[in-house]
């Protein structure tokens, strides 16, 4: 079994640009402050927020953007208008590394995902 490249969130952030690391940390902290029942886990070498064993929101970094996924095509579809400025796909949306997180949007996405899961709400 292969070992994780990033065993911790901090080790993941250490490989990012300062702007991307600051934005990633701000997004995760913003969600966890509003939803303390969620836990941060590294899975597939990227940070994921979980409710029990269910994935609620995932984050990843690329060279020119950060990606955020609520783990649900239905949630993405329901928020299509609000996500339009953020290069959405069926599964995720992209933000610039220096993005100032939209707390209301992140909270609403998580809330919708939790309703969909029927737990941790």
Could you describe each region identified by the protein language model?
Residues 1-121:
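Charge-dense, helix-prone N-terminal extensions
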């Amino acid at each position: 079994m292969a070992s994780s490249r990033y065993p911790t969130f901090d080790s993941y952030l250490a490989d990012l640009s300062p702007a991307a690391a600051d934005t990633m940390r701000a997004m995760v902290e913003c969600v966890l402050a509003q939803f303390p029942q969620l836990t941060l886990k590294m899975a597939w070498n990227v940070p994921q927020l979980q409710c029990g064993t269910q994935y609620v929101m995932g984050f990843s970094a690329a060279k020119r953007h950060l990606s955020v996924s609520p783990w649900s095509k239905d949630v993405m579809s329901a928020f299509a208008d609000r996500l339009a400025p953020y290069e959405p796909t069926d599964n995720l949306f992209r933000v610039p590394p220096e993005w100032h997180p939209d707390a209301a949007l992140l909270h609403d996405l998580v809330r919708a995902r939790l309703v969909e899961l029927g737990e941790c709400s």
